Amino acid sequence: MTTVMKFGGTSVGSGERIRHVAKIVTKRKKEDDDVVVVVSAMSEVTNALVEISQQALDVRDIAKVGDFIKFIREKHYKAIEEAIKSEEIKEEVKKIIDSRIEELEKVLIGVAYLGELTPKSRDYILSFGERLSSPILSGAIRDLGEKSIALEGGEAGIITDNNFGSARVKRLEVKERLLPLLKEGIIPVVTGFIGTTEEGYITTLGRGGSDYSAALIGYGLDADIIEIWTDVSGVYTTDPRLVPTARRIPKLSYIEAMELAYFGAKVLHPRTIEPAMEKGIPILVKNTFEPESEGTLITNDMEMSDSIVKAISTIKNVALINIFGAGMVGVSGTAARIFKALGEEEVNVILISQGSSETNISLVVSEEDVDKALKALKREFGDFGKKSFLNNNLIRDVSVDKDVCVISVVGAGMRGAKGIAGKIFTAVSESGANIKMIAQGSSEVNISFVIDEKDLLNCVRKLHEKFIEKTNS
């Protein structure tokens, strides 16, 4: 049996936690034939790397770089002391850490002197989080008596294009690179989040990259299971911080999990699911700090529970853009032009809805992308502030609603269920919220809508009470 185990930043947030993870891994190795580990950077390290790289560019202060290097060395040295008992293994790992930190310092000083931070350089800097945590975890596994080696994503066979910052996989050489190690009983500890180009340059895989790395390795190895170890005991019916009665969901289908992940569930990134789904590899979400908890199993089965609705997820810090114009009626390609313009400004559209009259299109984007979105629309369609029809503009007006949120109701039981949308919207009304936009995908396992963010708590609690608590009580 081949198992891929991915551990997130909180799971390896300290030396004690790294040793705890190493114990989980070695226990699994004794139970299974082959184990591959994918690891994130220690918690807060990636954010610190983002910050120092920007400071090196903007402030160009070498002293700040020196302070950061001292901080990062102390953090990882402390982790080594806590995670590893053998003095020999400690010294081996410290040599690797010293070499990489020296490399990082040179790059940051180069950014400060040149006043230049290219996407390629930024990816290289951000890669150090995982490149520093992986040797420590590998050392802790060796300290517990198992053979292990730390590998970078490229060394493990993740080959990408040159789209630095959000690289796409060109091909996988995972089987060729990892199978010989597994046959020798070695546990590879692979850096999540990063790959390499054909030319050998380090790339990052974008947000959620470590989960995605685990899925790619599972896909490449035809693994029996992919385990995502995090700081919660699986996927919940909603955010427990909003609804204290939220409960763990034992099983989800790939489609349900993808919808939940896309619409705000932080446990899993939606890109993780597709490689596993293509080969039918189960994904198990587990809690590092409660390893005996069963977690949530994600498979191809559309298991119908007693609840039509399985979960409710939310996205905050978004804005609703409403585009109006009778000139859009019957004009082919208008929507394509809108999305092309937004794509050129790298604006991600979270949700879309178009009225049957074709006179308006509504979009949900991140709040931080609003200005870029408006700039893109003006560049493509001209000044839509001139509201006379004589101007012959396709777009007559654009309005922006901030302080809104997206709520998504997800469940395979919704497929073909009569009257479910009406019941959902009745519950929303009872909560005192007003719906500003509605969207439903063709999968029929998700209904999403936009309301004012101030109404989010009451709305989620009412939906959870009506569709999950009452059904299961």
From Swiss-Prot:
PROSITE patterns: ACT, ASPARTOKINASE. It comes from the Archaea. The keyword Oxidoreductase does not apply. InterPro entries: AceGlu_kinase-like_sf (IPR036393), ACT-like_dom_sf (IPR045865), ACT_Aspartokinase (IPR054352), ACT_dom (IPR002912), AK-LysC-like (IPR041746), Asp/Glu/Uridylate_kinase (IPR001048), Asp_kin_monofn (IPR005260), Asp_kinase (IPR001341). One of its GO terms (molecular function) is aspartate kinase activity. Its EC number is 2.7.2.4. It catalyses: L-aspartate + ATP = 4-phospho-L-aspartate + ADP. The keyword Repeat applies. Pathway: Amino-acid biosynthesis; L-lysine biosynthesis via DAP pathway; (S)-tetrahydrodipicolinate from L-aspartate: step 1/4; Amino-acid biosynthesis; L-methionine biosynthesis via de novo pathway; L-homoserine from L-aspartate: step 1/3; Amino-acid biosynthesis; L-threonine biosynthesis; L-threonine from L-aspartate: step 1/5. Pfam families: AA_kinase (PF00696), ACT_9 (PF22468). GO terms for cellular component: cytosol. GO terms for biological process: homoserine biosynthetic process; lysine biosynthetic process via diaminopimelate; threonine biosynthetic process. It is an enzyme of class 2 (transferase). Keywords: Amino-acid biosynthesis, ATP-binding, Kinase, Nucleotide-binding, Repeat, Threonine biosynthesis, Transferase. SUPFAM superfamilies: ACT-like, Carbamate kinase-like. Residues 323-392, 409-473 form the ACT domain. NCBIfam families: asp_kin_monofn, asp_kinases, PRK06291.1. Belongs to the aspartokinase family. This is Probable aspartokinase. It comes from Methanocaldococcus jannaschii (strain ATCC 43067 / DSM 2661 / JAL-1 / JCM 10045 / NBRC 100440).
